[in-house]
Amino acid sequence: MSQNYYQILGVSKTASQADLKKAYLKLAKQYHPDTTDAKDAEKKFKAINAAYDVLKDEQKRAAYDRLGHDAFQNQQSRGGGGNHGGFHPDINDIFGDFFSDFMGGSRRSSRPTSAKVRGSDLKYNLTINLEEAFHGIEKNINFSSAVKCNTCHGSGSEKGETVTTCDACSGVGATRMQQGFFTIEQACHKCQGNGHIIKNPCKKCHGMGRYHKQRNLSVNIPAGVENGTRIRHTGEGEAGIRGGNSGDLYVDITIKPHDIYKVDGANLHCKLPISFVNAALGGEIEVPVIEGGKVSLTIPAGTQNGDQLRLRSKGMSKMRSTIRGDMLTHIHVEVPKNLSKRQRELLEEFKKESINEKENDGSFFNKMKSLWS
């Protein structure tokens, strides 16, 4: 009586996939024709590959356990599937370095496309204003995408019809052809690599399990988002083919330039015009802030044009943090162009008082030099 596949690999029927692979690699290395001169090495090597080819595949293994060794082999020979004892792909774990060097450092996989294909990822460009970036916001976006067919529920088959397993490849979606020591794996010609046959395709999706439509999706933009941030929405991309997993949606954020503020990380910069009187005497003025409303800013006496005053924690919010940046005000001292008679008289008095400072002496020229240094 011939050995069954579990006996060939020396494992129990409850062996895990990890145990199967470990046993296979050990035996394949032991009986590979290039590593031993034993007379029966080639025969054992083929038997080891045939056993692992079936047991590593959950569907094949289940069928093997259900039918038994002899009945399963008969079905395989009728269906045309199976490895038939050639090189199994996992043999690369043993001889990978050798083949990589021999083939110029490249080993390419020729595995066929499976029946279920993951949907494509999508990208959406979303423009928001600075206030929305500060507070965070829910935005509704519209885009075209492939969605799961609601008639066949992604199977690709007309409602009520069953999908049959391809008898040419036993549902694997691939056939193997032996050429010397190498096994070439290619997509099954009968099912085009799907592993099953759809005899009556769904009319709505034409057997693809999905179709295109306009979608409306609400996306959450967190407070403190920065320009150029990419937000991933898992599973909101295109639906997969024939029940495959959906891709992801990536929302790329662009923040529109603001009329008042310039953004520098979490800090905000703005120009603040003040009168020359406030600059000279100092005082309190109200300035607008990004969250809305105004706050009081102290102007020190003698403030010069171009001075920078900081409002702590009045900048942008930081994503996933309670910390805020600062707002930096750049002072612009405004000189009045049209003076009333009384204003001119007061300035003339101020000018006379200032003569004592002797602006035409050496200190005046030193001040001029400092402005250019």
Swiss-Prot record:
A GO term, aspect molecular function: zinc ion binding
Subcellular location: Cytoplasm
Domain (J): residue spans on this chain: 4-68
The UniProt record lists the keyword Zinc: yes
TM region positions: none
Gene Ontology biological-process annotations: chaperone cofactor-dependent protein refolding; DNA replication; protein refolding; response to heat
Cofactor field: Zn(2+)
Coiled-coil residue windows: none
Main location: cytoplasm
Positions of CXXCXGXG motif repeats: 149-156, 166-173, 188-195, 202-209
Function in brief: Participates actively in the response to hyperosmotic and heat shock by preventing the aggregation of stress-denatured proteins and by disaggregating proteins, also in an autonomous, DnaK-independent fashion. Unfolded proteins bind initially to DnaJ; upon interaction with the DnaJ-bound protein, DnaK hydrolyzes its bound ATP, resulting in the formation of a stable complex. GrpE releases ADP from DnaK; ATP binding to DnaK triggers the release of the substrate protein, thus completing the reaction cycle.
Entry comment, domain topic: The J domain is necessary and sufficient to stimulate DnaK ATPase activity. Zinc center 1 plays an important role in the autonomous, DnaK-independent chaperone activity of DnaJ. Zinc center 2 is essential for interaction with DnaK and for DnaJ activity.
Protein name: Chaperone protein DnaJ
Lineage: Bacteria, Pseudomonadati, Pseudomonadota, Alphaproteobacteria, Rickettsiales
